[in-house]
Amino acid sequence: GREAELASRLASIFLEKLLELGAEAGETLKMLNRMLITKDEEVFTTVDLLEIDRMTGDARIIKAGAAPTFIYRQGECYRLDARTAPVGIISEVRAAETKLKLKRGDIVMTSDGITPTDPKPSLPPTGESKTAAALAGAIINRWSESAATGDDMSVSVIRIA
């Protein structure tokens, strides 16, 4: 609902601003958690954070209560799940962290509000010329039938060039 949207937007802005200033991701999550817990009402949000070193391809995915992340590489699908609570639920953040090396042609996809029924779903046919935005739209069209009625849906796609 409206409260979830506001919590998500607040968390996004908070994380973005602090990370842009050079704050460490783990500490930033702890600060966000403390801020959400001190509210009078129950406020929580999921976090799905991707850090990429664009020179080396080294990447870190940090997840707290978030839906699966899918990495597509040379026709293979790798699913990253994290069985962690959202930020703002418990006093200590227990985010899951995965480190990996991204390569040219990799596609990283996360979603909210939709999860494919297949544990390792294939991507909609796109061809190499499709943009990440076009691929995100095709994914929403394909997977939206599995979404809960009335839930908002979003997909983020990053194609490594």
What does each model-identified segment do?
Residues G1-L6, G113-T117:
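Short acidic, Gly/Ser-rich segments with clustered Asp/Glu that frequently serve as metal-coordination loops
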Residues G75-E76, S122:
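Residue-level detector of alpha-helical segments with a strong bias toward transmembrane helices
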Residues E3-G75, D81, S144-D151:
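Catalytic core of PPM/PP2C metal-dependent serine/threonine phosphatase domains
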Residues N33-R34, R94-E97, I140-R142:
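Glycine-rich, charged/polar anion/phosphate-binding loops
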Residues G26-K30, L102-A161:
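C-terminal catalytic subdomain
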Residues I52, A95, I160:
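Hydrophobic pocket-lining residues within nucleotide cofactor-binding pockets
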Residues E42-V47, L80-P121, A148-T149:
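Acidic loop->beta-strand submotif enriched in PP2C/PPM serine/threonine phosphatases
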